[in-house]
Amino acid sequence: YEIMPSLVGSEMCIRDSIIRLSAKGQPFCFLAQRQKTMKQYEDKELLEKIQKYIGELSYTHEPENLYMPIEYVLGLGGKRIRPVLMLMAYNLYKDDVEKIYQQAAALETYHNFTLLHDDLMDKADMRRNRPTVHKKWDENTAILSGDAMLILSFKMMMESCPLEYISEVTATFSKAALEVCDGQQWDMDFEKRLDVTVDEYMNMICLKTSVLLAASLKIGAILGGASAEDANLLYDFGIKMGLAFQLQDDYLDVYADSSVFGKNIGGDICSNKKTFMLITALEKSSGK
C-alpha cells in the first residue's frame, strides 16, 4: 500500500489519499462502482455536519455530576477525524450521510472516553488547552463519567443501525475497542522498561491509535453497503494512517508550541512514556 506524503502533517487531506491508494497495483473496487449522480461531500462539509450533530447532543440527564463532564469533554472540540473518516467511507457508496451521524458520534464518544481515562492515568493537567476532567472535577468523577461514555458509545452505535449490518458493525467496533485497551496496557507496561524495541512500539501504537481509525473507515464502508474486500482495504489503509499520525504526535510532543498543541511539551517523555523518538535515542545511545 502507498500512503501519500501529503497525509503526514495534515488534518483532513484524507480523501485524495484514499482515492489514490491501490492494492497490488489495482484501484479499489468502489472506484468503478461510483454513481455519477451521487453527491460527494468535501471533508470540511462533513466536519461541519458532524460537529453540529455532536454539539446538539443533550446530556441533561440526572445525576448532573455524571453527565456534565461528558458534555464538557465532547465540547472541547478536536479534529473529529474518526467520525469524518466514517462519513467519508460511507460517502464512497452512498450520499445520505445523515443516516449514520449517530454511529459517527458514537465513535467520537468512545474516542473521547479513552482520552478522559488516558488523562487520568497519565495525571495530565491539560487537554486542548482546558483542564482535564479529573482536574476540573475529581478522579472518581472522571472514572465514572468515562464508564458512562463507554456504555453510551455502544448504545449509540447499535441504535438505528440497520439489522443486516448489526453483527458486522458490532464485531468491528468491539474488536477495535478492546484492542485500544490492549494498546493502553502495553503503553503502561513499557513505562517500566528501557529495552522496548521499535517493533514493539509500532505494535503498541497500532493497537492504541491505528485500530480505531481503521474501524472508522471499515464501519462507514459496511454501513454504506461496501463489499468485504473494499471494507478490509479501507481498514488496512486506516492502520497505516494511524501509524503516521502517532509518529507525528511523538514529534510534536517534543517540538510543538504548547499553545497550539494543547498539551504540555515533553509530557510523554517526562511521564516515562515510550515514544518513537525516545526509543530511537536510547538505541543510539547504547550503540545499537
Where do the PLM segments sit?
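Mg2+-dependent prenyl diphosphate-binding active-site environment of isoprenoid biosynthetic enzymes
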Residues: G55-G287
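Short, positively charged and aromatic/hydrophobic N-terminal segments
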Residues: S17-I19, R34
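N-terminal amphipathic/basic leader segments beginning at the initiator methionine
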Residues: M38-L57
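N-terminal amphipathic/hydrophobic targeting modules at extreme N-termini
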Residues: R20-F28
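Single conserved hydrophobic/aromatic residue that forms the stacking wall/gate
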Residues: Y1-D16
